[in-house]
Amino acid sequence: MKSYAKLNIFLKITGTRGNYHEISSRFILYKSLFDKIYFEKSEFQHSGEDLNIISNIKINGENIINKAFKELLKTKFKYEISDFFKTHKVVLEKNIPMGAGLGGGSSNAAAFLNLTNQTLNLNFSKKELIEISKNIGSDVAFFITEFESANVSGVGEIVENFNDDIPNLEVFTPSIFASTPEIYAKFRSDFMDKIDLNLAKKLKSLSTKEILKKYKNYELNDLLAPFQAINPNFKLKENEFFSGSGSSYFKIKGKI
């Protein structure tokens, strides 16, 4: 199964909820860049309590796919899921850069949930999978829906399909690892007074093409300023737009 990257056409902070930040954002699937995830029969049996994940890159810390697996084990299909992964491994082919604002980890978790649901015929609805994903990561819900474009709000759990007009986009990822918690913490400490609820509301109704034609990059992503405060050498040209918490940015290919 392909596990696509995402871009944030705009990302506005609208408030806080405990340690989380409420957002209003346009997410689009960026289908030119994707990881692949699939299941293969294992050569030996596992405990069924943790996944055997084979990847082309080293994954540090707690793997978000394993986190998704643990959430699935809390459902009524615990034994079917555990039994399957005693004899199967997860193969992950990574192409999406990590710490780049492209949602690679969240996309992998969603692809794992969707693929497990299909492979084991669990018949979870998208709504049920989104509920399962709430303890995994805030961007996972968008990827579960498989929408090409959506307005995402709350802390990422509200995903509304959007009939969009998306120009051809080109993505660039500089060699700067962006820590999402660090960028959000910087926004909370230094930039909360920049919240613009009126603009956040206005952007939701516009197509991606209209947004990129009408607005400046610093108006569209509230995380650009804290990212640049932490990485002062990072500069964008006028026709370049910041995605997520960085460090990736994108621009329109050709004329809009």
Residue ranges with predicted function:
Residues 1-100, 118, 122-128, 163-164, ...:
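ATP-binding N-lobe of GHMP and related small-molecule kinases
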Residues 6-8, 149, 246:
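Structural motif
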Residues 49, 143-242, 251-256:
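Conserved, helical-rich catalytic subdomain that frames metal- and/or nucleotide-binding sites
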Residues 100-129, 142-144:
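DPxDG-like acidic metal-binding loop motif
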Residues 104-105, 242-247:
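Glycine-rich beta-strand-to-loop/alpha-helix junction loops that act as flexible
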